[in-house]
Amino acid sequence: METHLYSDLAFEARFADDEQLPLHLVLDQEVLSNEEAETLRYVYYRNVDSAGRSAGRVPSGDEDDAPASDDAEDAVGGDRAFDRERRTWQRACFRVLPRPLELLDYLRQSGLTVTLEKEQRVRMFYAVFTTLGLRCPDNRLSGAQTLHLRLVWPDGSYRDWEFLARDLLREEMEANKRDRQHQLATTTNHRRRGGLRNNLDNGSDRRLPEAAVASLETAVSTPFFEIPNGAGTSSANGGGRFSNLEQRVARLLRGDEEFIYHAGPLEPPSKIRGHELVQLRLDVNPDLMYATDPHDRDEVARTDEWKGAGVSRLREVWDVQHRVRLRVLWYVNSFWRSRELSYDDHEVELYRALDAYRARIAVEYVLIRAVRDEIYAVLRRDSGALPQRFACHVPRNMSWRVVWELCRHALALWMDRADVRSCIIKALTPRLSRGAAAAAQRARRQRERSAPKPQELLFGPRNESGPPAERTWYADVVRCVRTQVDLGVEVRAARCPRTGLWIVRDRRGRLRRWLSQPEVCVLYVTPDLDFYWVLPGGFAVSSRVTLHGLAQRALRDRFQNFEAVLARGMHVEAGRQEPETPRVSGRRLPFDDL
């Protein structure tokens, strides 16, 4: 609750410069595991319009004067497009509550008033409270824009989800519109009553219609134990009854003494039965001056107003692909309700937004399909003759017909289950993040290592003894019998000095025995984007992941994990370095870690 209140105040303070509507979200075990929730480091978000462009405020002075060429923008790691894309991300504050709770009970225990139309118990093993922003330029909200949420962990890994503004806002905007209409009708009724009171106070001689008299007689009835004068003669004189009622209504609205109840004089709040309880501060220190006039009304703290108004609605929202479900809390006193925001929900813009989203997420499937096609192309080119590249003992009487059938089914299963967690994406992400300068530096270091050294020219290459160097690879393990695919497994690979075959171990140094299992196929991808499709026995199809012909800008937008996200204290939207305030979490964050 405190995180949502703080974020709401922060959004209100910068609304004039950065118009955003705050969305107060709650993430639970359906989104993150317990370990992921406790080790969460950053929460970022950005808005993308219906055309697929990032809708963000770029700081003054940081814009590029000259447009970049198509070749420069299409190069992997293009720095200018990388910087422009980076500025659209904004950091959100969050709080981790690492204990079981019931959401509505937790809100009530925090002092909030919960007034839901239909209450439902929401049990959580742990919760992450955060607030994201939706762009509303010129007080206009579009249901076709997309909100991108990115969670980042200290090791550099991250997860992305996309949400349509239509799913987030439609029900709340309709409910808020009904509330405003009800409030407007109530204000209009009060204004009409005030006009009627003024007419009666001015002594208007106009007679009220009979329907108005009947409604006034129902609303303002006579006292229970009082018989009005002329009640017995009202039947004889019909006009006297209406005249008497008009007079009583006029006297009631005018505030005559006989209609006012007096409870007696009130004592000062500092006295009980005439005894002084606390000495006035002015008597203690005559030079003390009050900040406000004694007759000014007391100002209610914003926290008290927030808690008193409480929560009006609790909504469940799915992402575009229906993978995760978040909960949105709508507070009554959120500042945006007084801004009179307009909401547009055009079907044409929604279709454009969905087309842009499909084109964006299609990049990963294009990569996966390209790897599959390359595997089939290598098999056709080599006529099915595969060399053994990984160390594994194979029996002489092994049935290769079963192996080829397994290869076909394993490829189909991998195509069906692979997504952004695949080893291809994990190997590609660092290359997109390093940039053109880092790629040139890496190539220069490689040339220096490959160049012959002077001592090698004189004495020949040295024979260095020791264990072979290990390399970090990523693997997708396809288990055909269980129809299970383990995506993005990090492994260590080294060549056997005796046979020259690859030996694969896990991060703890334990030997991986996938190749000796007859129902398992493995796809390995190196950081240089070389891949091995390995069949049982260590026989592999080797080739390279080609990026030619792919939309490089879409690749960067989809998969790059820029260093600015992981830099400590970096304001991504402004690009300036400042000390970082510690996040609020269930455990204290030591300042030494900042």
Curated annotation (Swiss-Prot):
Protein's recorded name: Capsid vertex component 1
Subcellular location: Virion; Host nucleus
Main location: virion
InterPro entries: UL17-like
Region Disordered: start-end pairs: 52-77, 176-205, 443-467, 575-594
Keywords annotated in UniProt: Capsid protein, Host nucleus, Late protein, Viral genome packaging, Viral release from host cell, Virion
Binding partners and assembly: Interacts (via C-terminus) with capsid vertex component 2/CVC2.
Entry similarity comment: Belongs to the herpesviridae CVC1 protein family.
Database matches in Pfam families: Herpes_UL17 (PF04559)
Function: Capsid vertex-specific component that plays a role during viral DNA encapsidation, assuring correct genome cleavage and presumably stabilizing capsids that contain full-length viral genomes.
Acidic residues composition bias: residue spans: 61-76
An annotated GO BP: chromosome organization
GO cellular component terms listed in the entry, alphabetical order: host cell nucleus; viral capsid; viral tegument
